[in-house]
């Protein structure tokens, strides 16, 4: 999706 979740490592695609 075009939505991205913020991860402790940075922004990661919600694939």
UniProtKB/Swiss-Prot annotation:
UniProt-recorded Gene Ontology molecular function terms: carbohydrate binding
PTM entry text: Glycosylated; contains 5-6% carbohydrate.
Keywords, alphabetical: Glycoprotein, Lectin
Source species, domain of life: Eukaryota
Known partners and oligomeric status: Dimer. The subunits show apparent MW heterogeneity (32000-35000 MW), which may result from different carbohydrate content, AA sequence, or polypeptide length.
Name the record gives this protein: Acidic lectin A1
Natural source organism: Psophocarpus scandens (Tropical African winged-bean)
Species classification: Eukaryota, Viridiplantae, Streptophyta, Embryophyta, Tracheophyta
């Amino acid at each position: 999706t075009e939505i991205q979740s913020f991860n402790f490592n940075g922004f990661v695609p919600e694939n």
